[in-house]
Design a protein with these regions (language model features):
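Helix-rich C-lobe and terminal helical cap/extension of kinase-like folds
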Residues: 157, 166-168, 174-190, 217-387
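Hydrophobic residue at the +6 position relative to the catalytic HRD Asp in the kinase catalytic loop
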Residues: 212-216
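ATP-binding glycine-rich phosphate-binding loop
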Residues: 19-30, 34-66
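Conserved catalytic-loop position in the HRD/HxD motif
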Residues: 208-210
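Glycine-rich ATP phosphate-binding loop
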Residues: 69-75
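ATP-dependent phospho-/nucleotidyl transfer catalytic cores
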Residues: 12-21, 33, 80-85, 95-206, ...
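Single conserved hydrophobic/aromatic residue that forms the stacking wall/gate
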Residues: 1-7, 11-12
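A short beta-turn/loop motif at secondary-structure boundaries
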Residues: 49-55, 152-156, 324-325
Length: 387
């Protein structure tokens, strides 16, 4: 159910990525002139007669100026009205059907629909997207494996956004990467590490990391490939408190401390304050017990998510609306990784990253979490965890 709560929006959006027919080229030219003040043929040295890609919210042209190629994204007409109409309809249906659905989630589906609706309205404001792109680029300026297209402010407005052109390979399938002499595993690692940085270091993350928004670039190495992010319309934040609690939850899963894990869920808002946490210890143990196998790296997020979804039908878990986009981003990113490598295990990459953060972060909260990793309940050093 975790995935299904965001799944309908994801399926609709992802099915439209790069698949919708282009809207009338004359309309696109009209929008460019209205937004930028001059016709496209006066603004750019070259401007094509048709877009190179067309998706749910707009279409992209490959233009040229000063011997450099640019990506000019033009918004579909009437999007504000169409999104408002669809969100109102979905909100009504969600509110009406919520009591009839066999979902014991403790929070109205309408709140989650509202969260996605807000994100969609933000996504069609290209001025906000431009600000997001600049902020995201600044966060990754010290990371040599992450590339963000340069914003061209003079050719950007509320319905048109222009950036430098990214010449890369979309992370759609393994064979496509291999045909271009690119190593899939290296891009999975860069993708996962950058996602972890966004959630646990920056507190600001790309909420739409589907294959069409991520490009594999030449360079890098067999360990970490060079990766470009595009499309910064759907972004979100996570508080420091939530970040720390999520790290604690991961540690409690690894240590098989299910009562403490239930407390983490309660603090994050997935369980009400009135909930008797002791009753959840055995169900959590059934779902998560043995999920790590012989090694931490064997943890299979998809299998656990599927089991947890069934658990949520029987116990009073809920999905706080502020986690809707976080879940969407994590599910999208794992789906992308599994597309490139069906045997992908997220903790093989995530656990060393989290361990490094625990060892290098000097905050008091992180130190407390580190002690939980190093010592068991009896105060003995957990050699296998430390190693």
């Amino acid at each position: 159910m975790i995935a299904s709560l965001v799944g309908s929006e994801m399926c609709i959006r992802d099915s439209l990525q790069d698949n919708l027919p282009a809207f009338d080229h004359k309309i696109a030219l009209k929008i460019i002139e209205e937004e930028l003040g001059s016709p496209a043929n006066e603004l750019f040295e070259e401007f094509p007669d048709s877009p190179i890609a067309s998706a749910s919210l707009g279409q992209v042209y490959k233009a040229k100026i000063n011997n450099s190629y640019l990506a000019v994204k033009v918004q579909r007409p009437n999007l504000y009205f169409l999104i408002r109409r669809d969100v109102v309809i979905l909100r009504f249906l969600g509110t009406f059907l919520s009591p009839l659905l066999p979902l014991n989630i403790g929070v109205g589906i309408g709140e989650i629909i509202d969260e996605f609706g807000k994100a969609l309205f933000d996504e069609i404001d290209y001025q906000k997207e431009a600000e997001n792109a600049l902020r995201f680029a600044n966060l990754f300026k010290e990371n040599p494996n992450i590339f963000i297209p340069k914003l061209e402010k003079q050719f950007s407005s509320k319905r048109v956004i222009t950036t430098s052109w990214i010449d890369g390979v979309k992370l759609r399938d393994r064979s496509l990467l291999e045909e271009n002499n690119l190593i899939p595993a290296s891009f999975i690692k860069t993708c996962v590490i950058s996602g972890l940085q966004q959630l646990f270091e920056f507190g600001y993350f790309h909420a739409d990391p589907h294959p069409g928004n991520m490009f594999a670039l030449k360079g890098g190495n067999a360990d970490c490939g060079n990766l470009a992010y595009v499309d910064f319309g759907m972004m979100d934040t996570i508080t420091n408190s939530d970040r720390l609690t999520l790290i604690k939850a991961i540690v409690h899963i690894i240590n098989e401390e299910y009562y403490l894990l239930a407390e983490d869920f309660q603090k994050l808002g997935f369980l009400t304050k009135e909930q008797d946490l002791q009753k959840l210890v055995e169900p959590l143990k059934e779902v998560l017990g043995g999920s790590l196998g012989a090694e931490v790296g064997n943890f299979n997020l998809k299998n656990v998510t599927d089991k947890f979804s069934k658990l949520m039908y029987s116990y009073p878990f809920r999905v706080p609306s502020r986690f809707a986009l976080i879940i969407r981003a994590v599910v999208s990113q794992e789906g992308l990784a599994l597309r490139l490598d069906p045997e992908f295990k997220i903790l093989k990459i995530a656990y060393p990253y989290i361990a490094k953060k625990l060892l290098t972060d000097n905050s008091e909260e992180i130190l407390e979490i580190l002690l939980e990793v190093v010592f068991d309940k009896k105060g003995q050093i957990q050699i296998e965890k430390v190693e």
